[in-house]
Design a protein with these regions (language model features):
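PRPP-associated nucleotide enzymes
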Residues: 1-126
Length: 127
C-alpha cells in the first residue's frame, strides 16, 4: 500500500489538502501514527500533538481487544463482554490500561496536557 510511513503521511496530507491552514490540529496515535502525523501536519501547516489510547485486550487473548481507553479516562466497550469475561477481570484490564495510558502520556508529551481542541478541526492519525 505505502512504501513507508513517510509516504503514507505525505499522501494523506495531499488527500486532506482542503484542511490546509484551517483552525485545526493533527493528533497522532503512537507509535507509528506519530511519524505519519508529522508528515500530515507538515503538509497541512497545522500543529501536531500526541493522543494516547489503548486497546482493552481480552485477558486470555491479548492480541484481540474488546474496547479501548483514552487519556480522559473514557472507556468504550460493548456491555456484552460481561457475558464472556468476569467483571473483576474486565476491571483489572481497564485499570492496567489506564495506568499505561498515563505512563505513555508522560513519555510522549513530557507531562504536558492535551491541547485544547474545542471548536477545532481535529485530524486523528494512526498507522
Amino acid at each position: 500500500m505505502f512504501k513507508d510511513r513517510k509516504e503514507a503521511g505525505e499522501r494523506l496530507g495531499r488527500a486532506l489538502e482542503n484542511y490546509r491552514h484551517c483552525d485545526g490540529i493533527v493528533l497522532a496515535v503512537p507509535r507509528g501514527g506519530i511519524e505519519v502525523g508529522h508528515y500530515v501536519a507538515r503538509h497541512l501547516d497545522l500543529p501536531m500533538s500526541v493522543i494516547i489510547v489503548r486497546k482493552l485486550p481480552f485477558p486470555d487473548n491479548p492480541e484481540a481487544g474488546f474496547g479501548a481507553v483514552a487519556e480522559d479516562d473514557s472507556t468504550y466497550f460493548h456491555e456484552k463482554i460481561y457475558d464472556w469475561v468476569p467483571f473483576h477481570k474486565i476491571q483489572d484490564v481497564i485499570e492496567r490500561q489506564k495506568d499505561e495510558v498515563k505512563r505513555r502520556a508522560k513519555i510522549f508529551r513530557s507531562g504536558s496536557a492535551l491541547p485544547d481542541i474545542a471548536g477545532k478541526t481535529v485530524i486523528v492519525v494512526d498507522d
